[in-house]
């Protein structure tokens, strides 16, 4: 399972909206009560634009909390109704941009974010959503500019977290971690929603895990669960960590809990890999079948898992032709580094190593420190008999995070040893011939 920044892209992959409408509501009220509150207001006055905006905001929050995309559909209806009544409501336009983003409709998200900025150029969150959409299509310089503008307007949990993500993409992991720590502190001071703070704590844990720092990752995941009990992202993150610690029974239990809350294909695949690792193939197969079932069902509900399925198929050497088609389809609307990585991995698995090399070089272009990227690069160069580069990237994968996957980390180590032996053998033979 890949839980590093922006890899978990199934339903919602970025922080939510910085603020809601200026309507009085009791501090700490549950999201369900907020939804009921705004619905009650609309019963009294069906043309209350702010109430529709508030309802849309609450529905988005609910979607983030439980991962149910239907709440985004309901939020879209409420926000469009708000804009029909009050066309210049920048907040509603910004929230609508976020709904489009959640569905991976990145062009529509960017368009609506720009409209929101035209209505209110001082709204930092609109710049944040614009940056998110630009990031997903690989426009990194434009995304960075949007995030920097957001930061100029507001030093918040949301702006800090986004800048942290940009730093992580460019390999500045220390800067990313520092920004996330500051984001959490700022978020707590501003009494931001618990889910937003928990998301940031989970992301901080994921950044530590990506560097193989298990104690810090554990601390962050546990804190995320304390902030927002049963938070599915933190449960899955802790499950991955327990697997790295070889505490497999605990990892299985945690993944099962996360899947019960939100059945994401990444989680089911990761659980299946643990079963495979500990010699329980029948249960592994059940989870792998669940991955495909989730993918089919989600497609019917217009939730796209092309990337997740393409990684899953390639990782497990099944449906490789279909998998490559899914990966290449990603490039039709997403051109971030992981779109190129999933294409590279699938080209490699389909025996097209030369093409895979071109794609993996694009995936590595920002200098992102991701063991999974390095592993893919190492295996691709290995297949091309580029021994030096293969050794370099496999070694980087293991030095970056020796726990990056319960199965593939061992594969990387074995491939690296094989390469080192072959190089040593070639050296001995060369000396013999020279003598």
Where are these regions (language model features)?
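Flexible helix-coil transition and linker loops at the boundaries of alpha-helical arrays
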Residues: 39-48, 81-91, 185-197, 294-301
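Residue-level recognition of tetratricopeptide repeat
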Residues: 48, 57, 64, 89, 98, 123, 132, 156-157, ...
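Register position in tetratricopeptide repeats
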Residues: 61, 68, 102-103, 136-137, ...
